[in-house]
Amino acid sequence: GDCAINLKPTEDQLAEIAWEVAECGKHFGIDPKVAFLSYSTLGSGKGEDVDKMRNAAAKAKELYPSLPIEGELQFDAAVSPRVARTKCPNSEVAGQANTFIFPDINAGVEDCLYASVLSGAWIC
């Protein structure tokens, strides 16, 4: 899913995007572990945006029970096993996520550009 296509996706759209991105990743040999990203990890923060990502993750889990999904997660909890052990030790995704669902265009584009610059990779 391209975060520039859905500028402010709804919870339902985010759930569908998670499935579509995971299926696409499988074509590239990726065993998807999906993290719905937020400024909160499993209720550590409060707000409308947190609720949106938590609800979207719950919808995706309900619709696609075979897909490993967690949310809402902060990026560090999503990718760092050390942080995940502290923030969400019972998660099957935290600390090993490889498929990221961003809440909107601001978060998605900025994070992709950040990763591109730091890694030297080109992201189309």
Task: Annotate the PLM regions.
Residues 3-7, 39-99:
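Active-site rim loops that border cofactor/substrate pockets in soluble metabolic enzymes
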